[in-house]
Structures are given as C-alpha cells and as structure tokens.
Regions:
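C-terminal interaction surface of TIR/SEFIR-family domains
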Residues: 4-6, 105-163
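Low-complexity, flexible helical/coil segments
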Residues: 14, 40-47, 70-71, 101-107, ...
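Conserved beta-strand-loop-alpha-helix hinge of the TIR/SEFIR fold
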Residues: 59-85, 93-103
Length: 163
C-alpha cells in the first residue's frame, strides 16, 4: 500500500513549484494529500479560519509523514504553521524540502530560499519552537535530486517514527 503523505506549502506563492514536486510523487505511484484546487480553496477560505483548519485536519487523517515544501515565505504562513503543529500532534514524521530552485511554470524564475530556522510556534513555557529543530531532515529538491530521492527521505523519516 502506498504511503499517504501530507504536503504543506504556501499556496499563493508556491503552488506551481509545489505541483512539480507533487506530480513527481504521484507519477511514481504514491498518494499525495494537501493539494486543493484554487477555486475550492477560496471557497473554504471565505468560510473562515475554522473551516480551513477543519479541512486541514481532515486531510491529515491517515497520513504518517508531512512534507513541508519550503519557499521564501512558507514557514511564516499561519496555515502552514497550523499544519506543522497538527502534524506533530498526531505523531507524523516531518521533513522540509526547499523548492526555491524549481523554476516557476509561469515566470520560469526561481525564488529566494526560505529560512528553515523560523519560529513556527511556541512551547507551553513560551520558548520558541524552530522548524529546523523539529523536523527529521531538510533537503533541497533540485540540488539533492528530489525527483529520485523524495521517497527515500520520506521513508527514512517514517522509520524514525516507527511508521
């Protein structure tokens, strides 16, 4: 059975780069969740943050690994931070994949790399929780050959969590 993986990304800025990663994943017979059509997302978003949170929670069901596709602003986005926190709560393995060097399909440009030492939340004692301290690995999709290695990274992280 294919591993069910949740992909988290900054929709507005990185949808095209994210689709490149997603398509490489599903063409290899894997199941990807966390992707939504823009019109559907806008409809959910109009219903408010709670509706978006419910959608995210539903998408996370049955997943064992969360892959955060890191663009320039990804880790600062509230919904991405929510996805990361909920993934950790459910015990998902967590990896980061930098996607800044993937050319955007529309503009054919690359973007800036996001800072992986970003605060994505706070512990109960108000100390900051940094993404790079919480994840099981950070990779670069282009420079680390993500097309061929994404599955290896995901399986390695899953095994660390006994999944």
């Amino acid at each position: 059975m294919a591993r069910r993986v949740f992909f988290s990304f900054h929709y507005q800025n990185d949808i095209n780069r994210s689709m490149t990663v997603r398509n490489s994943w599903v063409t290899q017979g894997k199941e990807a969740v966390g992707f939504i059509d823009k019109a559907d997302f806008e409809q959910i978003k109009r219903q408010g943050d709670n509706a978006v949170h419910r959608w995210i929670d539903k998408q996370l069901e049955g997943t064992s690994v969360t892959v955060v596709l890191i663009g320039a602003e990804t880790l600062n986005r509230p919904f991405v931070q929510y996805e990361i926190c909920k993934s950790l709560e459910r015990g998902n393995a967590l990896i980061g994949v930098k996607i800044h060097a993937i050319k955007d399909m529309r503009t054919l440009r690359v973007s800036c790399s996001g800072n992986t030492h970003s605060i994505i939340g706070y512990y109960n004692n108000k100390l900051p929780a940094y993404f790079d301290n919480l994840c099981d690995g950070i990779y670069d999709y282009v420079f680390d050959d993500g097309y061929n290695n994404l599955g290896v990274w995901i399986e390695s992280a899953a095994k660390k969590h006994g999944k």
